[in-house]
């Protein structure tokens, strides 16, 4: 396996944080959301709806990437922008929680290249048989993965389950006490804002006389996004040179 190193000047350039570039990245993803809906608003046709779904799923994947960058505090030079934008403009619209993701993801980085890496369960079985891969993709495109994700994320907001991205189910202990305890936890984790984001998107479309187009957003989230994220995970961590190496060049591709 060949490796190369970046010059100090190039490395400094790549590590430079920028508020305006971070703002541009966020604006581009939201522009993609607007474009996704605008196409179907302007040209109502089955082909337009299909294109809209894929554009919206692309934007959602972009929000997941923005959540990742803000979790690393690398998108903006101003720390408070990483916190606020990462949570309210990237994570919550796709039912995620940036603080919870950050805690989980930092554990992944700390343990990457070891058997204890929480993400390892998603790719350690690769390469899999064609039949196994087909079954995994079918679970994604049939909506099974997406629906389970929604249920899981709501439970994580409420403090019922521990935050996970692998499909692993683990009760969070100590558990909240009673319905009011779960409700307080849900609100404390901004679960209500994640729900309000869904109503806001529907409300904007309803005001334009096409509230039903929110269904395209739901379809993108439930049926397309899980497939995109699975392929991305496989590309990044499956069948790498040495999954148990502490060298990032050996246990990951990107």
Q: How would you name each of these model-derived features?
A:
Residues 1-57, 91, 95-215:
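Non-catalytic, topology-defining segments of multipass membrane proteins
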Residues 31, 70-71, 239:
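Active-site His/Glu-centered metal-binding helix of metallohydrolases
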Residues 57-67, 97-99, 147-149, 217-243:
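Transmembrane alpha-helical segments that form the membrane-embedded catalytic/substrate-channel core
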Residues 64-76, 108-109:
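Active-site recognition of the HExxH zinc-binding catalytic motif
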Residues 73, 77, 100-103, 211, ...:
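Juxtamembrane/interfacial segments flanking transmembrane helices
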Residues 77-91, 121:
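Post-HEXXH active-site segment of zinc metalloproteases
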Residues 249-254:
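Short, intrinsically disordered, charge-balanced linker/junction segments flanking boundaries
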């Amino acid at each position: 396996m060949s490796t190369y190193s970046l010059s100090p000047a190039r490395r400094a350039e790549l590590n430079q944080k920028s508020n305006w570039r971070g703002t541009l990245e966020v604006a581009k993803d939201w522009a993609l959301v607007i474009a996704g809906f605008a196409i179907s608003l302007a040209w109502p046709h089955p082909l337009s709806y299909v294109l809209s779904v894929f554009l919206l799923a692309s934007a959602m994947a972009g929000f997941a990437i923005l959540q990742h960058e803000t979790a690393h505090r690398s998108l903006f030079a101003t720390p408070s922008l990483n916190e606020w934008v990462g949570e309210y403009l990237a994570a919550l619209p796709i039912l995620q929680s940036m603080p919870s993701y950050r805690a989980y993801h930092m554990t992944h980085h700390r343990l990457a290249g070891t058997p204890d890496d929480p993400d390892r369960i998603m790719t350690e079985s690769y390469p899999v048989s064609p039949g196994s891969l087909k079954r995994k993709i079918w679970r994604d495109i049939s909506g099974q993965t997406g629906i389970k994700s929604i249920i899981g994320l709501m439970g994580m907001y409420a403090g019922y389950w521990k935050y996970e991205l692998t499909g692993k189910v683990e009760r969070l202990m100590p558990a909240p006490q009673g319905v009011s305890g779960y409700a307080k936890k849900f609100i404390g984790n901004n679960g209500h804002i994640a729900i309000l984001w869904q109503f806001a998107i529907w409300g904007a479309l309803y005001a334009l006389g096409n509230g039903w187009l929110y269904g395209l957003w739901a379809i993108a989230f439930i049926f397309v996004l899980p497939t995109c994220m699975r392929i991305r995970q496989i590309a990044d961590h499956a069948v790498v040179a040495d999954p148990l190496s502490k060298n990032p060049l050996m246990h990951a591709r990107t």
